Amino acid sequence: MKRNFPKLIALSLIFSLSVTPIANAESNSNIKAKDKKHVQVNVEDKSVPTDVRNLAQKDYLSYVTSLDKIYNKEKASYTLGEPFKIYKFNKKSDGNYYFPVLNTEGNIDYIVTISPKITKYSSSSSKYTINVSPFLSKVLNQYKDQQITILTNSKGYYVVTQNHKAKLVLKTPRLEDKKLKKTESIPTGNNVTQLKQKASVTMPTSQFKSNNYTYNEQYINKLENFKIRETQGNNGWCAGYTMSELLNATYNTNKYHAEAVMRFLHPNLQGQRFQFTGLTPREMIYFGQTQGRSPQLLNRMTTYNEVDNLTKNNKGIAVLGSRVESRNGMHAGHAMAVVGNAKLDNGQEVIIIWNPWDNGFMTQDAKNNVIPVSNGDHYRWYSSIYGY
């Protein structure tokens, strides 16, 4: 719908992995340094609040298992690597703590993101929020035995290698703000060498844990036919992507596409006016009605039980979010899709969400209405449209 002010974040990484599988933390400690090297992330300091570390260690396996079951993966064993931070170009942390989730081959499968609660907007009573998604996990695994830097701007995330060439590795559909400079300089090595400490993100911090018990005990409920068929590019069609994937799921078809949805609703728009147009809730409801559905607007976040019942009855839910950081720009408002819900083995209730920007799903605390997304922003879930 609406777009966001671009931000720049710098993250420097050094990659070197052995092909030897990791059995557990103890066996890893016996591997000599010359035989085993790890992905290292440059950070200003390695300090992590005790509450943050405890939350990650206590809950990561439950959240990861919920996504494994959504993806129909087999039971597996995981552990956490050392946490790292992401910095803006002024070398200030973005405020989040990132914990890589390692499989027994030493690769990163997921990223646990722990964020301070945004008091003004969040309905959660906890001090921190935890979310799990694939995020940059695949990217981190692609640069073994290389020293790289990861940067982000309005177009997405870049890897800068030792030859100073930048490659776009993860797109985020964001536009340059007209008030900003047309060109953005990539920081030289001096900008990141001031980050003196290194977090070995692929070094296990504890023994690997099997999710066998967790897997068996968890309750998972998903729109049976929900698939990610396309992702949002440089446009304002988040509502189009959301509705097309929900309708594809509930009708068990592949016929809906975001561009066709937007063209149906805005047949007379051309060029950039069409490319960057968004949809109102009324237009979203109208489109659902034209497709044989009876969508209803709910002026709040759906509860866990509502998601559970609607999903069981094959009724899709669209999330309507308002960006916390800024109410201006192309993505000041954003639509996402509810994939399903899960009750973790510890009793925690979560909602599984798909952001049209992403190639994977993410977990969301069912009692927290502020959703962190893959470009570092947060969206307050203020309304829902259900019944697709």
From Swiss-Prot:
One of its GO terms (molecular function) is cysteine-type peptidase activity. The record marks T214, Y215 as: Cleavage. Induction: Expression occurs in a growth phase-dependent manner with optimal expression at post-exponential phase. Up-regulated by Agr (accessory gene regulator) and repressed by SarA (staphylococcal accessory regulator) and sigmaB factor. It catalyses: Broad endopeptidase action on proteins including elastin, but rather limited hydrolysis of small-molecule substrates. Assays are conveniently made with hemoglobin, casein or Z-Phe-Arg-NHMec as substrate. In the cytoplasm, prematurely activated/folded ScpA forms a stable non-covalent complex with ScpB. The catalytic maturation of ScpA appears to reside outside the cascade of activation started by the metalloprotease aureolysin (aur). This is Staphopain A. It comes from Staphylococcus aureus (strain NCTC 8325 / PS 47). The gene is sspP.
